[in-house]
């Protein structure tokens, strides 16, 4: 089925909706684990190679879904970067009637388990998550690095920005080179 779909029924771009990489968030969404997307991408890439096709797989992701923390979005950024995606098809969670996610969004609790579930509802919380979609945009890099430091996930900085050095006291290249150019780093 996959070979038939990919080789004969895709006109250049196949849009799919894994929606997230975090198992906890995917469970709330009632979606399969992200590992299935990995498997599908391998099949997609293999069919493209063997059939001599040059098609794109376009994944759709969502931020600020109930249960999603900023750290989950940082992990999503690393995961999608490792898959060579520069995300375009993204959206912030929007409550829709009659869904478990909307019930959680408004109540703060999972309706079936009674478990308290974090949800980003304030604009600054939503923006803090959304920016990770655009890790490849230089305009977001400094803010992402500050956020990774704040959430104590400096380990992810080197995965997102290979030139970033994690050693104590070392700033990422854009800041260090800027200070060197302006002379602001010199002792007086």
Label every model-predicted segment.
Residues 1-92:
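Conserved AdoMet/S-adenosylmethionine-binding subsite of the radical SAM
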Residues 60, 96-99:
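Short connector loops at secondary-structure junctions
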């Amino acid at each position: 089925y996959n070979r038939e779909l990919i080789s004969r029924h895709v006109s250049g771009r196949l849009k799919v909706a894994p929606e997230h990489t975090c198992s906890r968030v995917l469970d709330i969404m009632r979606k399969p684990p992200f590992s299935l997307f990995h498997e599908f991408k391998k099949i997609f890439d293999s069919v493209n190679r063997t059939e001599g096709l040059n098609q794109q797989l376009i994944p759709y992701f969502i931020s600020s879904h109930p249960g999603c923390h900023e750290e989950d979005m940082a992990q999503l950024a690393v995961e999608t970067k490792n898959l060579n995606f520069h995300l375009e098809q993204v959206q912030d969670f929007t409550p829709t009637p009659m869904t478990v996610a909307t019930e959680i969004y408004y109540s703060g609790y999972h309706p079936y388990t009674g478990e308290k579930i974090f949800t980003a509802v304030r604009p600054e919380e939503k923006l803090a998550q959304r920016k990770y979609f655009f890790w490849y945009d230089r305009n977001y890099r400094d803010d992402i690095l500050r956020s990774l430091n704040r959430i104590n996930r400096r380990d992810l900085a080197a995965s997102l920005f290979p030139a970033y050095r994690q050693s104590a006291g070392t700033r990422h290249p854009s800041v260090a080179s800027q200070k060197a150019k302006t002379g602001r780093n010199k002792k007086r």
